[in-house]
């Protein structure tokens, strides 16, 4: 929901196609939301500022693709536990509409950043794979972002998620930006990153972030352009095992960076 909110650029937004029920043959991953998950998804959307949520779907298709899947109603056309839970959330909103109206999400001190170039390049690299390591899959960048979300949340802070193109780099004081395994750092963002750090923002970078520019040139060759901002430059990355530990307690995956 944060991704949608930031890309709405301050405009009202809805969240659509929230999963209503079980999937069997469709969907990338077999999954059925529990009633508790449904409530969590709805309240998360509301807390992010969404003005509405649309499920996919109320009832299942009867034939062909997605037949018997995704519905809030069961096969007997009775409300599922998910639909009953959604009704409870709607009831709270109806009873306390005036209290919710006009509320806006409080800005978080930590923002997790992604960029489209990283997703495109990661997907392109994954097309040639013969092995199954997570860090080399097309989903690696966004899974790293999800892992960072879990890690920051475990500290007691709920982070925001934003595209680098919509992040307010000028609002640096007291803020932390995390770039989790974003394999590309397009040239347009480099002066913004430097300005953010220079003006007091804290920057945390993980994985192979900045390995490429937007044209898939390796940035670590011929002088890393963000050396002064990052405080160091990488001389090389070495495969160190699928899972290993950096120092005494920092879990890592696949590559070890040598400074």
Q: Where are these predicted regions, by residue range?
A:
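Short, solvent-exposed loop/turn segments at secondary-structure junctions
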Residues: 19-23, 59-61, 116-119, 166-167, ...
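Hydrophobic targeting/anchoring helices
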Residues: 1-142, 236-241, 245-251, 255
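Alpha-helical scaffold elements within enzyme catalytic domains, especially in hydrolases
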Residues: 3-6, 44, 151, 192-196
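A short, well-structured beta->alpha microelement
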Residues: 149-170
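A conserved amphipathic helix/loop scaffold
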Residues: 34, 180-259
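Loop/turn elements at helix/coil->beta-strand transitions in domains of secreted/extracellular proteins
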Residues: 9-13, 48-53, 155-160, 173-175, ...
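Short low-complexity, flexible loop/linker segments enriched in glycine and/or proline
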Residues: 29-32, 67-72, 174-179, 218-222
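Generic beta-strand/beta-sheet core signal
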Residues: 16, 56, 113, 162, ...
